[in-house]
């Protein structure tokens, strides 16, 4: 447990330093110093104060600045804010993840975006289906070459 440092500022106020946090205890309640609370990636990017009711904070943590930068670059902060307000709270995380995926895909492929990735995957599925059909046909031909012969449980042929 980190060492706790306490010092009195005024008779009505006491400051406690515990780990990275600085807590001021007033007679009216407890207030945390804002310098230790990092703003969310969106507020940091937009250079504004991150409030407790920030719509971006739960979905754009300070550790992921490129996630918001990409989303902002493609969709714009105002549009993302509107989307988050229109979406039900339990669906917002999925909406943000979808926006982040689409933004990253659009930055990689400005013309097709995620549709280009979907197209590549569809072609890959078709190629693998054809390969599977060809392999099954080869297997049937091989089984047909054996004719009436069957194999025993021990791998030997019985005629």
UniProtKB/Swiss-Prot annotation:
Domain LOB, residue spans: 38-139
Xref: InterPro entries: LOB
Protein name: LOB domain-containing protein 25
Family: Belongs to the LOB domain-containing protein family.
Tissue: Expressed in young shoots, roots, stems, leaves and flowers.
């Amino acid at each position: 447990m980190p060492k706790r440092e306490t010092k009195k500022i005024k008779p009505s106020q006491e400051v406690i330093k515990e780990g990275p946090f600085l807590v001021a205890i007033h007679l009216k309640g407890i207030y945390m110093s804002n310098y230790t609370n990092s703003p969310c990636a969106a507020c940091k990017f937009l250079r504004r104060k991150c409030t407790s009711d920030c719509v971006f904070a739960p979905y754009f943590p300070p550790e992921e600045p490129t996630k918001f930068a990409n989303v902002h670059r493609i969709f714009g902060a105002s549009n993302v804010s509107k989307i988050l307000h229109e979406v039900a709270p339990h669906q917002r995380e999925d909406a943000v993840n979808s926006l982040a995926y689409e933004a990253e895909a659009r930055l990689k492929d400005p013309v097709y975006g995620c549709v280009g990735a979907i197209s590549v995957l569809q072609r890959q599925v078709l190629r693998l289906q054809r390969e599977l059909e060809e392999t099954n046909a080869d297997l049937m031909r091989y089984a047909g070459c054996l004719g009436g012969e069957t194999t025993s449980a021990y791998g030997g042929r019985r005629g």
